[in-house]
Amino acid sequence: MATRSLEKLASIDAQLRALVPGKVSEDDKLVEYDALLLDRFLDILQDLHGEDLKETVQECYELSAEYEGKHDPKKLEELGNVLTSLDPGDSIVIAKAFSHMLNLANLAEEVQIAYRRRQKLKRGDFADENNATTESDIEETFKKLVGDLKKSPQEVFDALKNQTVDLVLTAHPTQSVRRSLLQKHGRIRDCLAQLYAKDITPDDKQELDEALQREIQAAFRTDEIRRTAPTPQDEMRAGMSYFHETIWKGVPKFLRRVDTALKNIGINERLPYNAPLIQFSSWMGGDRDGNPRVTLEVTRDVCLLARMMAANLYYSQIEELMFELSMWRCNDDLRIRAAELYRSSRRDTKHYIEFWKTIPPSEPYRVILGDVRDKLYQTRERTRQMLAHGISDIPEDATYNNVEQFLEPLELCYRSLCECGDRPIADGSLLDFLRQVSTFGLSFVRLDIRQESDRHTDVLDAITQHLEIGSYREWSEERRQEWLLSELSGKRPLFGPDLPRTEEIADVLDTLHVIAELPSDCFGAYIISMATAPSDVLAVELLQRECHVKQPLRVVPLFEKLDDLESASAAVARLFSIEWYRNRINGKQEVMVGYSDSGKDAGRFSAAWQLYKAQEELIKVAKEHGVKLTMFHGRGGTVGRGGGPTHLAILSQPPDTIQGSLRVTVQGEVIEQSFGEEHLCFRTLQRFTAATLEHGMHPPVSPKPEWRALMDEIAVIATEKYRSIVFKEPRFVEYSALATPELEYGRMNIGSRPSKRKPSGGIESLRAIPWIFAWTQTRFHLPVWLGFGAAFKYAIDKDIKNLRMFHEMYNEWPFFRVTIDLVEMVFAKGNPGIAALYDKLLVSEDLLPFGELLRSNYEETRSLLLQIAGHKDLLEGDPYLKQRLRLRDSYITTLNLLQAYTLKRIRDPNYHVTLRPHISKDYMESKSAAELVQLNPTSEYAPGLEDTLILTMKGIAAGLQNTG
């Protein structure tokens, strides 16, 4: 039995209503949604596991809520006593219950956001300040540009036609929720939204409520834990599921809304179907940086699978078009083409469900589309055979080999309809289809290849040594450039089959041979991670030529570390000064900047400022050489890795650094948050498009010289402080490993790549994602804020007038404001008291003073941050976010304690607790606790501990809405 009677416990529903702020607005239904889902879940929990376990859940929640209200350490001690007395089976159920409740809270929030959005649009209210941190609507942006900023509608239209946002989906291991659960969450979200529809009947409501309970129970009964790590092919399939479920239909729907918004500002012309407004790329199966599981076979399979999926989607829609375009009037060009196709038709197509007999010439559009269908069928089947067997008996000329071939008959149909007075029909499903073909092509998404610069150096070093001309690795940068350019200007082959090859060298060359073998439209960019110099780019250009890549991929240097960002503009300027290279790029260059590793290298403050300056300098260099530069932003989901609200991130970039062309990564859990549902997909496309347009037509202010000088000065202080602790403090590596679940991260099986670039090594070799993940789990968020406090304190102590300047910067400079606001949000999610508990349980006694020093630094930074922003309390300007975070805190606290005590039991074999009798009715005394580890038979720990730990990690990640 629970230690306190049920009568003394407040229900979670009542606790929620007592805890959260008053109704934020008339559109606020969050608590109502949240309470409904929790009521249903608690009923299910009682049915499945009994009243005693439900009481224990409520008791844990109450103690957490009391702690969050008063921050009384005694409440943590009481909660710890409850949690440590649970037997392994009950621990798993409690962890799973709280993790599930946090997922339900997320779903309630998503439905609330969609509801508020609809209410806002109904009112025509585009100036809701409470939405400022999260919303950016395309129609709102058009009206702002034309009405407030006096841009002409034609200027807006022209800018939009030439704008491109390329969203690059990556398999970064930050999505901790299994696909099986994501699908169930989607159905829960749908049921909840429909339950609150105004026109719902009593019978509908009853059936929806039953469906809601069914899906909640199904999600709870599904194993949350991935029992094996996903392969790169698994990651690609998971990523492609978003295209199939939401993006495929979302793109034409969004572009139709753009047409409507244009019409509302006086443009009576549709956006051209081939305007590259939204593009999609992927790293899934192409990102080799530190991931040995991405092989040439993986890259080949991923490309072919994507092509097969694209052909299948086109094929599934072509018959709908054939039904729609039944008219007989057409222009002469189409009539002639249809007659030719009709005469050459030799057989009935009995493998089709519809239109399986020869289509008569009196239906010319159907004749044309029937031929398109035939080629799509053959394209799909040939790709399927290539994927399965490596060869196909279907001739290549019976299929579509490039997107121009595919578009031509569709364009012919479109022109004919327009010329015959049927433009409204042309602008229906056919226009949507044309836009899909233009956006997705035959490859569905273009695959980027990413590889470390050192791996290319290894290959070239092997070549030069084999040629007996020295060691490329030991050459100076000038010598490397001289040799590379000499070879690029010549024609001799550099190596043959006798080149000695290590496994790593073979991987680089085999990858390039796969690129040469597959259709060129499968690929996008070749990204060089850890790029430092011009030779890194020239090396890839030479290797592409040597491996016979007929249409070379554009080569994109990725500058990540602080020093590399500082020298990026000089490296690019040198490239632009090389005549061979200028001729190669044809006036266009792409440069990627990395937010994750720069933050791990120098801290968030200095990294953010250096990223800002690097972009300014790169754009300046590009303008001087007449090159159109596209910035590729490698942003993660967390603030520590460059994350934050999309449109604010874009609008705070330096002036002229976007210019209508933007690439950005969409990583891990951010993919689900951006594309998990149709309305989320629509909102994501709106935000990126609107913010990119606004940045180009109404650039943010440039920082004043005195602001720059102050930022330069304090960035040095921030970097010194950060590095003095993370890299120079001898106690830090040991403390970090003990005070966080850093070492246990890999057990979550949420990605195919290792958590370290090298098996040994300290913080330097640890990847940015587990680095951020570990500190996020303990709610201390050290990588985000460390260095801020020292920088601000230095400036204010030096001259109190600097505080006034900080206020000015916060109020007038979008970059500075966004930087401060995001860190303020992280502090609102933080809890140093919880971090202190991890220290108390897990850290050796000699390291405890170090932890206290860091927490003192945390409090000082928090206080200084509020001074800079001119705020009394955290998030005082964002009541919606404040409400959402407070709703989650009590769930997360329970999981934090359960995680900390579980880590204690895992790491300290001498730590013993007194367990009370089993309380869940699912496992009776006649069943041994050993059954609990049937799902995890290989665990090296006592029964239930590893699963409990992983469930707490997933739950905390869900509650904080990010992992790494």
Curated annotation (Swiss-Prot):
It catalyses: oxaloacetate + phosphate = phosphoenolpyruvate + hydrogencarbonate. GO terms for molecular function: phosphoenolpyruvate carboxylase activity. It is found in: Cytoplasm. Keywords: Allosteric enzyme, Carbon dioxide fixation, Cytoplasm, Lyase, Magnesium, Phosphoprotein, Photosynthesis. GO terms for cellular component: cytosol. The modification Phosphoserine is found at S11. Homotetramer. Through the carboxylation of phosphoenolpyruvate (PEP) it forms oxaloacetate, a four-carbon dicarboxylic acid source for the tricarboxylic acid cycle. Tobacco, a typical C3 plant, shows characteristics of C4 photosynthesis in cells of stems and petioles that surround the xylem and phloem. This is Phosphoenolpyruvate carboxylase.
